[in-house]
C-alpha cells in the first residue's frame, strides 16, 4: 500500500485521482489516504479546557501547521511557541507561560508527544493536550480491513 497521511479531511476525489496517477509511475500498490481527527482538549487530570480563556500553544514537532490551523479555527490562540522537532525542554523555555498559566490568564496546550517532556517541568500545573488520530475514509478503511482479513484467513 501507498498511504498518504495528514491529507485534508475534505480531499476531493479528483485530487485523490491525481495522487493515484502520480503514484502509478512508481508502484501498482493500492493508494489510500488518511486525515487527522482531533479529540477534545484535556489536561493531565482529565479536566476540559476553559473555552473562555485564551491558549498558548507549545510544540516541538517537525511541522505544527495542522495543529496551529485547527486551534486557530476553534479557540482563541494568543501565543504560539514552536521549537525544533525533538527539542529537549527546559523550564526557562516556558517560564513566562507558566507564570501566566498559574495566574489564570492562559492555558498551555501541546501535543501528546510534547506532554511527556513538559509535564515534569510544569510540576503539577495544568497542561492541556490535543489528542490526534489518523483516520481512513470509510471506503479506504474497508479495503484495508478486507485485505488484512483475507491475509489472516489464508
Spell out what each predicted region is:
Residues 84-88, 125-154:
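Short, flexible loop segments at boundaries between secondary-structure elements
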Residues 70, 120-121, 141:
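Short conserved micro-motifs at the rims of enzyme active sites and ligand-binding pockets
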Residues 11, 116-118:
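Short glycine-rich, flexible loops that bind phosphorylated cofactors or substrates
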Residues 107-112, 128-131:
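Conserved active-site loop/cleft motifs that coordinate metal ions or position small ligands
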Residues 20-23, 75, 118-136:
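A short, gly/pro- and small-residue-rich
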Residues 64, 112-116:
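Short, polar loop motifs at secondary-structure junctions
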